[in-house]
Design a protein with these regions (language model features):
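Conserved phosphate-binding elements of NTP-dependent enzyme cores
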Residues: 3-7, 14, 525, 539-543, ...
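C-terminal tails and terminal domains of large nucleic-acid-associated
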Residues: 823-855
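ATPase nucleotide-binding head domains, primarily ABC-like/P-loop NTPase cores
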Residues: 29-32, 215, 284, 289, ...
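Amphipathic heptad-repeat alpha-helical coiled-coil/stalk segments that mediate oligomerization
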Residues: 193-197, 202, 252-253, 258, ...
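A conserved P-loop NTPase coupling/switch region
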Residues: 24-45, 138, 148-150, 170, ...
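Basic, polar low-complexity surface loops/patches
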Residues: 1-318, 335-341, 345, 403, ...
Length: 855
């Protein structure tokens, strides 16, 4: 056995090997140590190898999915070695000592999951391959749970943005590539000619022209991905729809840093909660949620396609009764896309067929409702017919399956009564046999006088009589009619001729019934598979309707407006809000302050000043998010919006050290800013916050100054630039398209009041000390800062130099000494108070004295 295991382990390579032994998957050697630690299960031993005990652990087959989930989340890949014959077949083949044949039937990886329990219902699960050829780069992406297959042509500079858009579970590349990948595969699998042949074979075509014009890099990526999926499925290739080829300019370009900064689909920490997607998502199906995430990750550049999406959202927005009817119907839908994916992968169950039946039937009813609409929007008129056309399959599945089919087909019981007369007869025969066995139990009790006698069944003995050990002697007599089979602690088991006869009737009928059901299941599966492409199209149509209805619901909730999209590079937003922050403020019982933004040609660059916590960063981000939502086909959080299409979106807001790559916060900021200056076009939208911080004041100011000039003169894009360098406001004198704005704040009775309102002109002051006091800095520190600030401002007024006057500030200034004396006096006063002896009036007087000492 161990020789067989080692041979399979060599085939599994770097995967953990689940080796099937009866009702368990066993692991040995280093695999056992890794799995035991990861799964928190006992590490035992079995036999010896090279003179040492073999480490071993195992998990039950029936619970394997839960253990697989933990291993995959921990970053492992798992090869499944199943028994490919029964022990009886092995004995017939090679005698009583023959080893049961085993083979690896599947490699489970993060990107190739289809099991419902292992997947997030509301997120796509992409497995991607990166192909390179002649300096070009392409990414092929497949979600094997639904069959989506998409190809993106890019270059090395844009690879990161493409991968960030997909957020893949697994990345595969050639072993000759330097790309950071989850798995590197043989170079030959990424050969473009081999890739073309592999795709032609997969789709049974002589040419790929019907799918588009593929570059060599695209063929390399697609071929490499198909080869990898074939490897993990061990020849049972999962369902892949015809590939969709994406041109580089079909969607808004958003790099990885911008996605992270704006938290489009994932918030800080890698979770959905707190992201734009989380704030917008009102979908009621898993497929709708996955499609919405895709829409937000890749906003469109085609004004016509955006308008078609918006028309559909508007129809549902303007007709709340229709919207609620649709959402109520959609809410009850099963995920037919993923059910189909499991069926195609050979991992389908009777329940998956039941989900197809119920989902397609509900889709048909939904289509009937939509056909009644007068003047439907063009997109709805296009997709509504896709909801129907499955009548014959629905009728077959309705007749064939019970209302709630089981997940496990092994026990039968999923074919409906009346579908197959012969199967019904077998079931009646089996039921008759079970009634006969029940009658025998009553008869045996009467004959023997043993009230505790029971007829039981297990996989080893079959049907048998079981009595307490104290009553077994009565059945041991030769003329009792019972044959002893097994003695256990407390019970003794017997057989009887008439029981054996009845049991044979039940067993044979049951086996024949199971075989008949399995045959029907195979036929039903083949019938469904014949319509897999049409079913996938229906699933897509349902998802699009769910997305539109959900966006309409969100717009109605928040009073959002339909954006107007124009050809020229304008950006006019009235009453704009940040959807995530607004929701958080509302939960806290507050009210979000809306602001306008008008980046017309004459003021396409706004320089925004004002105090920290005043709302500058929120204002910058909210306008970037409005652009994303508009081009995704959504209403936007504003009272009015008129936007020119944005080809590239950049955000340099907030940064942190990238220690893994040896980059400081300032270095990260400069790299991101350099990318913006190199890539932004006049149609781009850029938000920049505090460029230049992290270095000396003069260096930072000089960099910020030069960046503003470059964006104004060279990139000429729409830009919101927030800064604390008030010196930059002088650029308004020489940059005709630069407009000055600030977030308003006021001091009231010594306290800072942040108004979160945007006003024209520069801020009159930074309010830095007020914000520091609001943040809780010690009074002594605030006082010292005031002293330093006064000297700095005096020096600046006298010499024009920022550092003038610093020489007059000793490390331990007089104010600090005075405050130290005040602290000592306060301590002395506190030490002289006998708290237990004070009356309430005396305590209040003492408190006032102490307050006077504290100033």
């Amino acid at each position: 056995m161990m020789a067989q295991y080692l041979a399979l382990k060599a085939e599994a390579q770097d995967c953990l090997l689940f080796y099937r032994m009866g009702d368990f998957f066993e692991m040995f050697f280093e695999d056992a140590r890794i799995a035991a630690a990861c799964l928190d299960i006992a590490l035992t031993g079995r036999g010896e190898h090279d003179g040492e005990r073999i480490p071993m652990c195992g998990v039950p087959v029936h619970a394997a999915t839960a253990y697989l989930q933990r291993l995959i989340k921990a970053g492992h890949r798992v090869a499944i070695a199943e028994q490919t014959e029964t022990p009886e077949a092995a004995k017939k083949r090679g005698g009583s000592k023959a080893l049961v044949a085993r083979a690896i039937v599947r490699v489970v990886t993060a990107g190739t999951l289809t099991e419902e329990a292992l997947l997030d219902a509301r997120a796509a699960n992409w497995c991607v391959a990166v192909g390179e050829a002649g300096g070009d780069v392409a990414v092929a992406a497949a979600d094997v749970s639904t069959g989506r297959f998409e190809i993106f042509e890019t270059d090395m500079a844009g690879l990161g943005a493409t991968l960030a858009r997909l957020n893949p579970a697994e990345v595969v590349a050639s072993e000759a590539s330097e790309i950071d990948a989850t798995s590197h595969r043989p170079r030959a699998q990424f050969d473009s000619a081999a890739g073309e042949a592999r795709l032609k074979s997969l789709y049974g075509v002589a040419t790929l022209d019907g799918f588009g014009q593929f570059s060599r890099a695209a063929l390399s990526a697609a071929g490499g991905l198909v080869a990898y999926l074939d490897h993990t499925a061990k020849g049972a290739l999962p369902f892949l729809r015809p590939p969709v080829l994406h041109a580089g300019d079909a969607s808004m370009a958003i790099d990885a840093a911008t996605r992270e900064s704006l938290e489009l689909t994932l918030a800080t920490g890698g979770t959905r909660k707190g992201s734009l997607l989380d704030a917008v998502d009102r979908t009621v199906t898993g497929a709708g949620a996955r499609l919405l995430a895709q829409d937000i990750a890749a906003p469109l550049m085609d004004a016509g396609a955006i308008g078609a999406r918006l028309d559909l959202v508007q129809r549902f927005h303007d007709e709340p009764n229709l919207r609620e009817t649709l959402r109520s119907s959609l809410r009850a839908l099963p995920d037919i896309g993923r059910a189909l994916g499991r069926i195609v992968a050979g991992r389908g169950s009777p329940r998956d067929l039941g989900q197809l039946r119920d989902g397609l039937d509900a889709a048909w009813a939904l289509g009937e409702r939509l056909h009644q609409l007068a003047a439907p929007p063009p997109l709805l008129a296009e997709i509504a017919p896709r909801l129907q056309g499955h009548g014959a399959l629905i009728d077959l599945l309705k007749r064939a399956l019970v209302p709630e089919p089981p997940i496990d087909a092994a026990g039968g019981g999923y074919i409906a009564e009346g579908f197959d007369a012969a199967l019904d007869d077998l079931r009646h025969t089996g039921a008759g046999g079970r009634r006969a066995i029940a009658a025998l139990e009553a008869d045996y009790r009467k004959r023997t006088g043993i009230a505790a006698l029971k007829i039981r069944h297990n996989g080893v003995l079959g049907y048998h009589v079981e009595v307490p050990a104290r009553a077994a002697d009565a059945l041991m007599a030769p003329d009792s009619g019972f044959t002893h089979r097994q003695t256990l602690a407390g019970v003794v088991r017997f057989n009887a001729a008439d029981l054996h006869e009845a049991a044979m009737q039940v067993t044979q009928a049951g086996n024949h019934a199971l075989a008949a059901e399995a045959s029907h299941l195979e036929d039903l599966t083949e019938t469904a598979l014949a319509r897999r492409h049409e079913i996938a199209i229906t699933a897509d149509a349902l998802a699009r309707i769910d997305v539109a209805a959900g966006l309409a619901e969100r717009a109605a909730e928040g009073g959002w407006a339909r954006p107007a999209l124009v050809d020229h590079a304008c950006f006019e937003v009235e009453g704009g809000r940040h959807p995530v922050v607004e929701a958080a403020v509302a939960r806290a019982g507050g009210r979000f302050v809306a602001n306008d933004c008008d980046l017309s040609e004459s003021s396409r660059l706004w320089l925004v000043t004002g105090p920290n916590m005043g709302g500058k960063s929120t204002f910058l981000r909210q306008n970037a998010l409005i652009a994303v939502l508009a081009q995704a086909g959504s209403y936007v959080p504003a009272t009015r919006a008129k936007l020119g299409l944005v080809d590239r979106l950049f955000s340099r807001v907030g940064a942190s050290d990238n220690l893994a790559r040896g980059r400081s916060t300032f270095m990260v900021e400069m790299v991101e800013t350099a990318a913006i200056l190199a890539q932004a076009t006049p149609r781009s939208f850029v938000i920049l916050d505090e460029v230049g911080r992290g270095t000396s004041t003069y260096d930072g100011l000089a960099i910020a100054w030069a960046v503003v000039e470059a964006i104004h003169e060279d990139n000429r894009c729409r830009c919101l630039f927030a800064t604390h360098y008030h010196e930059l406001t002088r650029l308004a004198e020489r940059c005709e398209a630069l407009s000055l704005h600030h977030v308003r704040a006021r001091e009231w009775k010594g306290e800072l009041v942040l108004l979160h309102e945007l006003a024209t002109g520069p801020a009159d002051r930074s309010y830095g000390l007020a914000v520091a006091r609001l943040a809780g800095l010690p009074p002594a520190t605030i006082a010292r800062a005031k002293s330093v600030l006064a000297k700095l401002e005096a020096g600046r007024a006298k010499t024009g130099g920022l550092a003038a006057g610093l020489d007059d500030l000793p490390l331990f200034a007089a104010v600090a000494a005075q405050e130290a004396e005040a602290v000592d006096e306060l301590r002395t006063a506190l030490a002289g108070i006998d708290v237990d002896a004070l009356s309430p009036r005396e305590a209040l007087d003492a408190l006032y004295r102490l307050k006077g000492l504290a100033g």
